C-alpha cells in the first residue's frame, strides 16, 4: 500500500472555504422536528463553494481509470474536466490526447512516456497499459467488480480477539470531561440514512460487531451533522452514515486484528479513538431522488491509497462529491481524517471520555 508521502507528491489537498459553524438555538434539540426545522432554516441559501457539478466522465474511459506499474513508480490514470490524464513521478496531471480507442498520446513529451496503449479484459476493464513498448500491469487495489468492500485478513481469529477485548478495560483518563450525552442521529433527523457496516458482515473484517444498526453521537456533534445534512439538500444529497459512536472494545479488536502495514486505518486502543468518544462519524452522500449511495473515488473502509482525501485518481465527479461532503462537514466544525475521506472528527472530541458502552445499554432516553 502506498504511504502518505507517495500522495503528497501531487501537492496539497484542494483548498475548501469553510462556512462558520452555526449553532442550533437553545431547545431546538428537544425533538426531532425542532432540530430539523432549525437546521433547514440556517442552511437556506448557504453555498458550500465547491463549484458546479462536473459532467460525467465518458463511459469508454471508465475501465481505464486506475493504477498501473510497480510500487516505486505508480502510474495513475484519472479523468479531469473531460480529459484523461496521467500522474507519475516525472509528470503531474499530464493530459492524454485520444488517438484511437484505447490509444493515447502525451500532450507534452515526458521521457519514456509518449504513447499509452491499454489492453482490456472481456468486461471492458483495462488489465495493463503499454507505455512506449513497456507493459505496466494494473494494480488491483480496488474491490473486484460488483463488490463494495475490501477485506483484511485478521492476524488472529476475530471471535478470539473479541473475547479478549470484552474482558479488557479502556485506558484510565484524567481530566474534567463533559458527561456523555449520546443521541441517535436518526431521531434528530429522520432524513439521515443508515448503512451501519459493523452491524453486518459487509466490513473489512467480515464480522458482525454491533447488535443493532444504529448511529449515536454526543449531542453537539449530532446536531452539527444535522446541520451539514440540511446544507446538502440544496445540492440534491443527504448523508448516509456507516458508523458513529463505537465502543472501545470494538476498536481494540480492529487494532489487534489488523496487520502492521494497515494500522494507519485503525485507532490504537491505548489512546482510544474519537469514535469511542462519540465525536467521530463515518459517512458518505446519497442521492435524494434515487435514494442510492453516491460513488466516490474509493469504497468505504478501503485500506488503500484511494481512501486518502487528497488522492488524485478517479473522475472529476467523484472528486467533486468527495469535496462537497468535506465542505459540508468542515463548515460545521468537523475535520477530515488524513487517511480516510469518509471519517470526520468533531471539534470538541477532547471534551469527552472514552466510551465502552454497547448500543443496547445506552440509556433509552437517548436512543
Task: Report each predicted region and the residues it spans.
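Bacterial N-terminal signal peptides that target proteins for export
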Residues: 2-14
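Bacterial N-terminal signal peptides
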Residues: 11-23
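Peripheral terminal and inter-domain segments
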Residues: 27-156
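Extracytoplasmic cell-surface/polysaccharide-interacting catalytic and binding patches
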Residues: 146-242, 257-339, 348-367
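Short, well-ordered surface patches within globular domains
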Residues: 250
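Short active-site loop/helix that positions an aromatic residue
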Residues: 253-255
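Conserved metal-phosphate-binding beta-hairpin within the catalytic cores
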Residues: 344
Amino acid at each position: 500500500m502506498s504511504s502518505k508521502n507517495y500522495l503528497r507528491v501531487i501537492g496539497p489537498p484542494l483548498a475548501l472555504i469553510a462556512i462558520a459553524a452555526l449553532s442550533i438555538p437553545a431547545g431546538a434539540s428537544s425533538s426531532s422536528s425542532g432540530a430539523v426545522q432549525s437546521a433547514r432554516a440556517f442552511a437556506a441559501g448557504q453555498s458550500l463553494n465547491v463549484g458546479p457539478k462536473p459532467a460525467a466522465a465518458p463511459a469508454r474511459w471508465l475501465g481505464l481509470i486506475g493504477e498501473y506499474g510497480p510500487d516505486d513508480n505508480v502510474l495513475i490514470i484519472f479523468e479531469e474536466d473531460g480529459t484523461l490524464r496521467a500522474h507519475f513521478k516525472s509528470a503531474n496531471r499530464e493530459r492524454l490526447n485520444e488517438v484511437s480507442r484505447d490509444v493515447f498520446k502525451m500532450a507534452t513529451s515526458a521521457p519514456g512516456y509518449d504513447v499509452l496503449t491499454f489492453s482490456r479484459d472481456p468486461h471492458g476493464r483495462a488489465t495493463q497499459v503499454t507505455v512506449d513498448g513497456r507493459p505496466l500491469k494494473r494494480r488491483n487495489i480496488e474491490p473486484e467488480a460488483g463488490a463494495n468492500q475490501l477485506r483484511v485478513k485478521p492476524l488472529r481469529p476475530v471471535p478470539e480477539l473479541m473475547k479478549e477485548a470484552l474482558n479488557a478495560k479502556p485506558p484510565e483518563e484524567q481530566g474534567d470531561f463533559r458527561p456523555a450525552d449520546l443521541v441517535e442521529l436518526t431521531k434528530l433527523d429522520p432524513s439521515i440514512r443508515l448503512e451501519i457496516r459493523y452491524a453486518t458482515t459487509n466490513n473489512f473484517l467480515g464480522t458482525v460487531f454491533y447488535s443493532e444498526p444504529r448511529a449515536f453521537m454526543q449531542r453537539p456533534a449530532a446536531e452539527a451533522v444535522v446541520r451539514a445534512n440540511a446544507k446538502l439538500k440544496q445540492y440534491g444529497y443527504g448523508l448516509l452514515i456507516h458508523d458513529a459512536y463505537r465502543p472501545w472494545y470494538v476498536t481494540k479488536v480492529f487494532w489487534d486484528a489488523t496487520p502492521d502495514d494497515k494500522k494507519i486505518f485503525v485507532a490504537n486502543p491505548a489512546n482510544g479513538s474519537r469514535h469511542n468518544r462519540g465525536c467521530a462519524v463515518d459517512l458518505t452522500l446519497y442521492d435524494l431522488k434515487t435514494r442510492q449511495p453516491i460513488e466516490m473515488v474509493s469504497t468505504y473502509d478501503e485500506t488503500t491509497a484511494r481512501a486518502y482525501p487528497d488522492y488524485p485518481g478517479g473522475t472529476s465527479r467523484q472528486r467533486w462529491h468527495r469535496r462537497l461532503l468535506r465542505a459540508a462537514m468542515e463548515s460545521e466544525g468537523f475535520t477530515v481524517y488524513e487517511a480516510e475521506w469518509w471519517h470526520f472528527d468533531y471539534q470538541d472530541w477532547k471534551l469527552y471520555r472514552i466510551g465502552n458502552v454497547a448500543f443496547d445499554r445506552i440509556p433509552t432516553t437517548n436512543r
